[in-house]
Amino acid sequence: MINQNPKGGTELQFDYLTKYVDNKLLSEVQICTSVPEKIPLHPTKVNILWQKNSYDQSNLYPWFKNKDNHKKYDWYVFNSHWTYEKFRNHFGIPEDRSVVIKNGIDGIQKSASYQKGQPIKIIHQNTPWRGLSILLGAMQLVKNPLITCDVYSSTEVYGKNFYEKNDHHYKGLYDQAKRLPNVNYIGYKPNSYIKDNLHKYNMYVYPSIFEETFCISLLESMAAGLYCITTNYGALFETGAEFPMYIPYESNYRNLAQKFAMGIEAAANTLHEEQIHNHLECQSAYAQAYYGWNKIGTSWKRFIEGAVNAKK
């Protein structure tokens, strides 16, 4: 059965917000996510635009370009410093009414340390236009027989309507994934399934060619203690800090695929080393400590309390 309703990062984070912040406090504000005025502005409550989309997306760029619109919201909340800087530089948004509260994680089990000679399992759980073609190109070049990659890539994460309109564009990529001997194409699974199974993997590989404003799949993989390989495109370097192996983004995708193949092989050769084990322990602790929703929820609580009191 096709997933009926969108359940991407925006929806997941909103669910966490309602889980970790008191509903009575949330009832004092109106939060609109990403697309301005997709829900009407409230006449009396504090209006907050929680911005997670990129500055250049067509469904919001014209609204932000018109500075008369900026006064409509009491506060703008951005999911990364990268996102805030892009909106500030491109649109001159009100700096005194802007805050950064990053996305968070919840309920991530850590994987066991990899031991030499074990199978090496890679997970890729990103939508197909964000780099699946690069990943498949890289996997064709990977020769280590221990390495396999499970691909959970589909447009279904954004609901039935989006899936029916768009998924056929990527059938060729899905078919290619199914043909590769070291790739298992699985398709859509809900985030709850991904989180429950992350600890069974050793590596997360995301050759992103999409300007992420944050990256929840990277953060969850870091928390699970997976060795992460990604580009430095968009806000990925902010999400990952110093922990992933970063392959510098380039528009020559053939070169990028070759570099990712080399990165995967190099990482696989060192996964068993104590230094890498310690690195991944530190990575997991960092992600859990700074991005757990118990901490993120506290940031939201304090922000909303202040915003409500300021309007009284």
Which residues make up each language-model segment?
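N-terminal pre-catalytic "stem/leader" segment of glycosyltransferase-like enzymes
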Residues: M1-L41
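Short hydrophobic beta-strand element within catalytic cores of glycosyltransferases
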Residues: Y227-T230, F237
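Donor nucleotide-sugar binding/catalytic pocket of nucleotide-sugar-dependent glycosyltransferases
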Residues: D74-R88, I93-K110
